[in-house]
Amino acid sequence: METSLWATTAFTVLMGLLSTLVALPLAMGLAWLLARRRFRAKPIVETVVMLPLVLPPVATGYLLLQMLGVSAPVGRLLDAVGLEVVFTWKAVVLAMIVMSLPLLVLTLRTGFEQIDHRYEQVAATLGASPWRVWLTVTLPLARRSVVVAALLGFARALGEFGATIVVAGSIPGQTQTLSVALFTFMESGRDAEARDVLWVSLALAALAVLTAQLLRRREARP
C-alpha cells in the first residue's frame, strides 16, 4: 500500500526527532567522558563509538540485525519480554541512533574541549557538586555545541539509508523513510516520485545544516 510523500516526510522527521532525543544525552555523556577523563579503555571506547562512521552502513545494519536475532542474547531478551524491534519503527530509530551517534559525539567533544576548565574549578571550589557543576557551568557553556550537534545528528538521521533498509526494511507507512522511498522509486523506474522525494530530502537536510552553520558562525564571533 502506497503512502503519500507528506506522510513519508512526517514519518521520517518524527523518527529523526525521536532518534536525536535518545542519542543526544548518550552522546553528551560519551563526549564529556572522552574530553575530560583519562582511563585505560579510552581508545576502545573511541573506536567503538566511531565504528559506524567508517563501516559501510549496510554492514552496520547487518550487525544490528544479528544482535537483535533470536539466537543472540539481546534478541532472546527482547523476545522474552515480547518486544519486537526488527522491521518495525523501533528498528528505524535504532539505526538512526547508531549512525548519527559518532557525529554527535565528535561535535560535542570539540565543544567540551573548548570550555575553560577554570570556570568549573571555581564552581567546585565554591562547594558545587560535580553534577551541579555540570548542570550550571559546563552545559550552559556548551549549549551552542549541543544545539549544533543535535541539528547535525538530526540531518544525519534523516539521510540514513543503508542500516535502516537492512534492519527495518521498506514497509510503506511503517518503516519507509524518505531515503528508503527514494531508493524504492529509483529501483522501480518511478523517476517523477523519486525526484519529489529527492527535493524534499535536500530541503530538510539543507535547512538543518544551514541552521547549524549559522549557529557555529555566531559561536565563533568574539
Regions found by a protein language model. Name each.
Residues L5, L108, S129-A150, F154:
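Short hydrophobic alpha-helical segments within the ABC transporter permease transmembrane module
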Residues L30-L64, E120:
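Cytoplasmic-entry segments and transmembrane alpha-helices of multi-pass inner-membrane transporters
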Residues G69, V146-T184:
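Non-cytoplasmic
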Residues A41, L106-A128, R132, V137, ...:
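C-terminal transmembrane helix and the adjacent membrane-cytosol boundary/short C-terminal tail
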Residues M1-A7, V167-A206:
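Interhelical loop and adjacent transmembrane-helix boundary motif
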